[in-house]
């Protein structure tokens, strides 16, 4: 029985969150009418000259730093030539010879087993137009042409579909945490191309690889890799050649389809972009690009708060939720996380929206929990209070009073109510000497019912025990 090793390399394109395009001053607006956000530079008119987007360069440096890469201080661009309708210039401006970042790595954990993914390069380039294929024709929207991209290319070091999914998800979290990209597979702001081959275990040579393009979910990445591995194994045992092909996954059947078979290496005729001179990136400029807290640093911080794993993973999976949580100044983060997820996130889920879209002022969440700590309100009242904080900008204490959410802590008032309960339920109370827990539970339950759950439970418990003990002195 021959054991095989899977060899996987991944190319990820991330769409950068800049206001304008990579080489033109055109505003990026994904909601604009088709072909209204493209100018002569984007469309390749003769005589136009590209201008490099400074923000995109900063984002690339930031990502290179996050991935521990060597940063090229000479910013240089090249032309990649090919003919296709989505590329009106006949070439794409990219960085073939001199990528802005080289030789980085990211450490990952697969069920307790740590491994490192070596990244060959990251480079800046421009996106192409969006294609809409109909039955008998195709439509092109050049609004996307020229949008800044960073391509991240690994060495062929991944060995399974699980490792590939972990890597893509890790890059997603990095770019979202850095806030340089939306990093969403489902909308195409992060696009993954997977290169797969197999070889006998121990072999050092590479066989023909199959490239699977534009995978738009972790589920599809896993399905595509596992199907392709099975296909290549079957070809090996049938003594058939694995053709160098480009494939895609069919969204309906979730099966692979061949787009084209490569019979020769494509000559893209790369050469330096003559209209963009070398740009020297000074040490001062590179050092001015600061990193934000990275996902693994954020994870360590949350673990120091003793957050449970469900809350921790929810925060790490959604940078916007994490930012909202972090904006709440309440100091006990463990207690905060329990209330935040039980009340705020649950409220958002009931409305089928995100917690950070509820428009609840983070400072009001802190004030509400402080009122709970001060025993001004009860846990039950807090549950009623949180929905009232949506769009609320005024005095939270007044809101509590207006809605009768204050906790009853007056010992005299509580004592009088308990004495009345004991008086009107004398037959049951007679059992107290022999069945203390049952009677006490009844009295406290009746007290909560009569007061709408507004009584301070600690004070109520002490007074109830004292009152019952006095009856049987």
Curated annotation (Swiss-Prot):
It catalyses: L-glutamyl-tRNA(Gln) + L-glutamine + ATP + H2O = L-glutaminyl-tRNA(Gln) + L-glutamate + ADP + phosphate + H(+); L-aspartyl-tRNA(Asn) + L-glutamine + ATP + H2O = L-asparaginyl-tRNA(Asn) + L-glutamate + ADP + phosphate + 2 H(+). Its EC number is 6.3.5.-. PROSITE patterns: GATB. It comes from the Bacteria. The keyword Protein biosynthesis applies. One of its GO terms (biological process) is translation. InterPro entries: Asn/Gln-tRNA_amidoTrfase_suB/E (IPR017959), Asn/Gln-tRNA_Trfase_suB/E_cat (IPR006075), Asn/Gln_amidotransferase (IPR018027), Asn/Gln_tRNA_amidoTrase-B-like (IPR003789), GatB (IPR004413), GatB_Yqey_C_2 (IPR023168), Gln-tRNA_amidoTrfase_suB_CS (IPR017958), Gln_synth/guanido_kin_cat_dom (IPR014746). The keyword Protein biosynthesis applies. Gene3D superfamilies: 1.10.10.410. Keywords: ATP-binding, Ligase, Nucleotide-binding, Protein biosynthesis. GO terms for molecular function: asparaginyl-tRNA synthase (glutamine-hydrolyzing) activity; ATP binding; glutaminyl-tRNA synthase (glutamine-hydrolyzing) activity. Heterotrimer of A, B and C subunits. HAMAP family: GatB. Allows the formation of correctly charged Asn-tRNA(Asn) or Gln-tRNA(Gln) through the transamidation of misacylated Asp-tRNA(Asn) or Glu-tRNA(Gln) in organisms which lack either or both of asparaginyl-tRNA or glutaminyl-tRNA synthetases. The reaction takes place in the presence of glutamine and ATP through an activated phospho-Asp-tRNA(Asn) or phospho-Glu-tRNA(Gln). Belongs to the GatB/GatE family. GatB subfamily. This is Aspartyl/glutamyl-tRNA(Asn/Gln) amidotransferase subunit B. It comes from Mycoplasmopsis synoviae (strain 53) (Mycoplasma synoviae).
